[in-house]
Design a protein with these regions (language model features):
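The DNA-recognition helices of helix-turn-helix-type DNA-binding domains
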Residues: 55-56, 82
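Short Lys/Arg-enriched helix C-cap and helix-to-coil transition segments
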Residues: 59-68
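Basic Lys/Arg-rich amphipathic helical interaction modules
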Residues: 1-50, 67, 72-87
Length: 87
């Protein structure tokens, strides 16, 4: 997990903005890494990982034996369902 946290921390501001821009410009069936989703949603990687384990976060796909990804469609649906008018 530390490697992933370091990966985001090592990204330049330009790389972060490019990742976010790419997310918004690709089709809804595109699959994104947890790092990109964390940047787009302003969430931590540890939050995404915890919610994957608990089963109540953004739906994910296994893209390899040790890799997960998120479709843009699932990310947008999750954000839409979790909108609030007050606290």
């Amino acid at each position: 997990m530390k490697q992933r946290l370091d990966r985001i921390a090592r990204m330049s501001e330009e790389q972060r903005l490019n990742s976010i821009h790419q997310f918004w410009n690709l089709p809804e069936d595109a699959v994104f890494s947890p790092e990109v989703v964390a940047l787009v949603c302003d969430m931590s990687l540890s939050w995404l990982q915890a919610k994957r384990c608990q089963g109540n976060g953004i739906p994910f796909v296994k893209v390899g034996p040790r890799k997960v990804g998120y479709t843009k469609r699932d990310v947008l649906e999750f954000l839409s369902k979790n909108r609030y008018l007050n606290t």
